[in-house]
Design a protein with these regions (language model features):
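Signature of extracytoplasmic/envelope-associated structural regions
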Residues: 1-317
Length: 317
């Protein structure tokens, strides 16, 4: 008896294309995205029946609404990460620099784009397509010596299983990763070397509870909401400087820079307040302090609670 071929993760790929009209899959513009993993899928509950029929046997269940969502882990790289930033913030403001360099600035805007995602299992000619996809959350963690990645939570509208890809000639991008060891950080506008780690969480406030009658259980639309920006800074406990900012509610700022040759990624939090969180004595080793924070927009000239500046050789996104 012959054994059917099984899809292999190494042979699979994730292709993303931005939609001109929400939920409408384009036929061109696909970009093959480098990823570590993707749990994007559609799930549908079966609801138990409460019908009484004169027998102890259960009646057939009914099908519920369909949730297309999941978490994607991409590397933080020189070219590809710009597409994730575009999904989060929309098209950047791009300017040409010296030589072949281009600077792309991503900020919080009035709306978010949508995209079609395709998980292609080419060894079994099956293509799992999700339309009307928006980014729900982004999480980044800096510090340590592990591979630098992001966690991207997405929410979509419709899943379609196809035998051919929506774009037969997607763009293949060069993969050049940023690394933790290339990071520098400023706190309050001053470069510091006592910070162990920085976590950043961005919640885009999506409303996925939009199941209209007549759409076969799929979402009809995904509305955007107010963005939440928070995180935690972990530093050596050397003095009271950080803790005093939390105690007094003093506004501060953070700026993290990653470099790779002539390429760079700068993340700015122009306005933030630390949450009061005193250190403790956990043992005989050095004492650290963890400072949760919330970023916001008040009166900074950038007019964005968080912004990303990506410099690379790509002309536009």
């Amino acid at each position: 008896m012959a054994v059917a071929k099984r899809a292999q993760g190494a042979q699979s790929k994730l292709t993303m294309a931005f939609e001109t009209d929400f939920g409408v899959t384009p036929s061109t513009g696909g970009v093959v995205m480098p990823i570590i993993s993707s749990s994007l899928k559609a799930s549908q509950n079966l609801n138990d029946s409460n019908v009484i029929r004169g027998t102890r046997n259960p009646a057939a269940p009914s099908r519920g609404n369909i949730d297309a969502s999941g978490s994607i882990t991409p590397p933080v790289d020189v070219i590809g990460f710009g597409y994730w930033l575009k999904l989060a913030f929309g098209a950047p403001t791009s300017t040409a620099g010296a030589g072949s360099a281009h600077k792309h600035v991503f900020k919080i805007g009035p709306d978010m784009p949508s995209a079609t995602f395709e998980q292609g299992y080419k060894d079994i000619s099956t293509y799992q397509q999700f339309s009307g996809v928006r980014m729900n959350k982004m999480a980044l963690n800096f510090g340590g010596d592990s591979e630098l990645t992001a966690t991207i939570d997405v929410m979509g509208c419709k899943e379609t299983m196809a035998a051919v890809p929506f774009d037969t000639a997607p763009t293949q991008i060069a993969f050049t990763p940023f690394e933790n060891l290339e990071a520098t950080i400023k706190e309050g506008g001053v470069t510091v070397a006592n910070i162990l780690s920085l976590s950043l969480n961005i919640d885009f406030g999506l409303d996925g509870d939009s199941y209209a009658i007549g759409n076969k259980g799929f979402r009809t639309y995904i509305d955007t909401g107010i963005v939440g920006v928070s995180g935690t800074l972990k530093a050596f406990f050397q003095n009271m400087d950080l803790l005093n900012k939390a105690v007094n509610g003093t506004e501060s700022s953070l700026e993290l820079t990653l470099t790779k040759g002539d390429n760079s990624l700068v993340i700015k939090l122009p306005e933030l307040i630390y949450e009061r969180n005193s250190p403790g004595i956990d043992g005989p080793k050095g004492v650290n302090i963890e400072m949760p924070f919330k970023a916001y927009y008040g009166d900074d000239s950038e007019q964005s609670a968080v912004l990303f500046e990506l410099t690379n050789t790509q002309a536009s996104y």
